[in-house]
Amino acid sequence: MAHDSPPEFADVSVIVAAYQAAGTVARTLQSIAAQTLKPREAVVVDDGSTDGTAEAAEAEAPRMNGIRLRVFRTDDNRGAGAARNRAIAESTEPWLAFLDADDEWLPEKLERTMSHLEGTDRVLAAHDYWTGEGETARHHQCEKRFRGSPDPFVGLYRKGYIPSCSVVGRRDAVVAAGGFDPELRNAQDFDLWLAMLKQPGTPFLVFGEPLLRYHLTPGGIMSHTERRLRCGVAIAARYYPDLRARPGSALASLWFRVTALHLEALRVYGAQGNIVKLLLTVGLWPFRLAAATISCLMLPPAPRGRFLTTDGTAGNG
């Protein structure tokens, strides 16, 4: 949608998936309203919450500093992928930015990101981020991983260095890739970035400014570990065929990714003191690695579904 409006607004829709976020969604929306370069709209989808999330979001409308705030509800909890697809289907701008309802942007996030996108052919840009605050704050340096790989796509496949709430991407590229896979209950964002960037030569950027703060909820980082592992292995197998068009060993990248996923699970189970699941993960590791290898070498790749139609409305996959 073209506009002749003041330069303090950018042609961006912010996609906010929210679930049981009544206590945090105001902070998220306030960080959008505080941008030095404002998006034209924020589209919130309340994914079946029972705590008044949608009402808490709607209450922020008078404080959005001219940004259109549109809030939608679903009757049941369908997951973040489905909620984001609904928000994308409702969006009206050529650029999409993503922010979850418990996290926040720093004030210059959108201005700095759009400076790396406008006038270029890049399909998306992302950046570093913070976790924690004060003395416990940690700067996560995503740009180093981006710069550290001869092929950024292979590096992304191996190390998953794009944080979803830092991304601004072209709406048409998101739609062409098919949107978020709602069947993946974890890592839908990682799957979509790989789908958008898998064609060799697709330009994207990760820059080194920490313009996002992730708020780690108690237990959140340690929840759904087994589900994250299963989804991660499925995604690794899904994009194995795309590695064959790249320099280097596709099998080595597959093994690297599957191993990294298991090491992450082991760290979580170790921190929890869950010895049973830790030992089970160690025992299953070689079998999962072998199964992924055999599947990738012997079976034809399953096509990725289309979860947004070509006109950007929500599809069924």
Residue ranges, per PLM feature:
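C-terminal subregions of glycosyltransferases and related glycan-biosynthesis enzymes
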Residues: 4, 191, 198, 204, ...
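Short aromatic/hydrophobic "clamp" motif used to bind/position activated sugar donors
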Residues: 96
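Short, acidic, metal-binding catalytic loop of nucleotide-sugar glycosyltransferases
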Residues: 30-39
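Conserved nucleotide-sugar donor-binding catalytic segment
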Residues: 146-235
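N-proximal low-complexity "stem/linker" segments adjacent to membrane-targeting elements
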Residues: 1-31
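Glycine-rich, basic loop-to-helix element that forms the pyrophosphate-binding segment
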Residues: 74-91, 112
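Conserved donor NDP-sugar-binding/catalytic core segment of glycosyltransferases
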Residues: 108-139
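A conserved acidic beta->alpha catalytic loop
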Residues: 31, 46-55, 76, 100
